[in-house]
UniProtKB/Swiss-Prot annotation:
The active site is at 136. One of its GO terms (cellular component) is tRNA methyltransferase complex. This is tRNA (guanine-N(7)-)-methyltransferase. The gene is trmB. GO terms for molecular function: tRNA (guanine(46)-N7)-methyltransferase activity. The lineage of its organism: Bacteria, Pseudomonadati, Pseudomonadota, Alphaproteobacteria, Sphingomonadales.
């Protein structure tokens, strides 16, 4: 590994934090045992709309889906699209499986692990939308390279998106907000869609609220919603 690659966020594969929290309840354990194997994407398989869903439907991708509220909501709004979600933590995976089971959602596939691994497997120019909502802000300057919002990962997202596709990013952390605006402002492959401040201070109607966002609002935090078009 070269000196430059050591500092390239695409080479960072360490996951910080616990991958499992509390013990699973019987129903949750059943979902992991029976439903997860039907929906799980591995790093060894082919990953395309046809491979995952049997047809060439539009694809959307969420990086770190948390407990799955947003991904499930988007999938229910557009049942003719295919949705891929990646989340390393079992509690989050169980949350999404619960949404899928309760609502009989058929158009989601998921990966328990690093989103970059699956992004790299996708065909170039295949994604209609990509989502990065409330990622860990890593607020200390010395941890900036751990932020997903860096040129390495964003460049990979750009390569996997269709021209005219949309990348959405949300955060309630001011340091991450400013950092994201700096990174995205340096990229000629994305166009910020905001016309007025209201556009990134108010959640769009087709942007389901996450549990994390709700908690942030309850704490009195401002939340910022960014939409970018792939050009």
């Amino acid at each position: 590994m070269t000196e430059s690659s050591i500092h390239d966020p695409l080479t960072i594969r360490r996951l910080y934090g616990r991958q499992q929290g509390h013990s699973l309840r019987p129903k949750q354990a059943e979902l992991v045992e029976t439903l997860l194997p039907q929906l799980e994407i591995t790093t060894e398989q082919a990953v395309s709309a046809t491979d995952l869903f049997g047809d060439d439907r539009p694809l959307e991708f969420e990086i770190g889906f948390g407990k799955g509220e947003h991904l499930a909501g988007q999938a229910m709004m557009r049942p003719d699209h295919g949705f891929i979600g990646c989340e390393p933590f079992l509690d989050g995976v169980v949350g999404l499986l619960t949404h899928i089971d309760n609502n009989q959602i058929k158009n989601i596939r998921l990966h328990r692990g690093d989103a970059l691994d699956i992004l790299e497997q996708l065909p170039d120019g295949c994604l209609d939308r990509a989502y990065l909502l409330h990622p860990d802000p890593w607020p200390k300057a010395r941890h900036a390279k751990r932020r997903f919002m860096n040129h390495g990962p964003i460049g990979l997202i750009a390569r996997k998106m269709k021209k005219g596709g949309e990348f959405r990013f949300g955060t309630d952390h001011p340091i991450y907000c400013h950092w994201a605006m700096m990174i995205m402002g340096q990229r000629p492959d994305f166009e910020w869609l905001a016309q007025t401040p209201r556009d990134f201070l108010q959640r769009p109607e087709d942007w389901p609220q996450t549990r994390y966002e709700k908690k942030a609002r309850e704490k009195g935090h401002e939340v910022w919603y960014f939409r970018y078009r792939r050009v």
